[in-house]
Amino acid sequence: MSRAKAAPVAGPEVAANRAGRQARIVAILSSAQVRSQNELAALLAAEGIEVTQATLSRDLEELGAVKLRGADGGTGIYVVPEDGSPVRGVSGGTDRMARLLGELLVSTDDSGNLAVLRTPPGAAHYLASAIDRAALPQVVGTIAGDDTILVVAREPTTGAQLAGMFENFGKESHVRARHPGLFRRSGHLGGDQLDRQGDRP
C-alpha cells in the first residue's frame, strides 16, 4: 500500500497561527487519504509544523472533520466538509461526487421522481453535500439522514433514471481509477462514457 503524500507546502509562515495550520490540515485531507491522527501529525511534521495530539484533535473538531468508512467496510479516512455554493458545470464538483459515489454508495432504490441512495452509517450528509455541490441539472435537491439520501429528480427525469445515473457514476469512478485513458467526456445523462476505442488492441 502506498503511503499518503502531503499536499504542496505553502511555506512555514502560513502555518504560524491556528488558521494557517488548519488551512494546511484541510489541504492535506483534501489531497491524501489519512487514516489516523498520528499519520496526519507526521505529514504536518514533514512540512515543519509540529503539533500536539490535543491540538490536532481540537483542530479536527473545529474543522468539522469526520472519519468515514467506505462501502467495503475498510479503514476509515478523515474528510472535511466543503463550504461554499455549488458552481454549475464545473467538472471538479462532478468528479468529486463520482469518486465519493464509488467509495460510499451501497445501494439505490427509487419511487416516482425520487431516488434513494444508501451509504455506510454516518456518510449520507457528506455524500449529499457532494451531490448538491455538483449542481446536476437533473436534481432538484437532496435530504440526508444518517445512512440514507433522498434525491428529488427534476422533470422529465424519473427517480429510476436518477438512481441509475448515480450507480453509473460510482461504477465509472472505479474503472477510471484503474484505466483513466478509457473515458471521454459526454453530456449525456450518466456522466462519462467508456471510449470503446480503448478496448481495442
Curated annotation (Swiss-Prot):
UniProt keyword terms in alphabetical order: Amino-acid biosynthesis, Arginine biosynthesis, Cytoplasm, DNA-binding, Repressor, Transcription, Transcription regulation
Domain of life: Bacteria
One GO BP: regulation of arginine biosynthetic process
Coiled coil: none
Pathway: Amino-acid biosynthesis; L-arginine biosynthesis [regulation]
One Gene Ontology MF term: DNA-binding transcription factor activity
GO cellular component: cytoplasm
Compartmental location: Cytoplasm
UniProt key word Repressor: yes
Residues covered by region (Disordered): 182-201
InterPro entries per record: Arg_repress, Arg_repress_C, Arg_repress_C_sf, Arg_repress_DNA-bd, WH-like_DNA-bd_sf, WH_DNA-bd_sf
Function: Regulates arginine biosynthesis genes.
PANTHER family: ARGININE REPRESSOR (PTHR34471:SF1)
Family named by the database record: Belongs to the ArgR family.
Name by which UniProt lists this protein: Arginine repressor
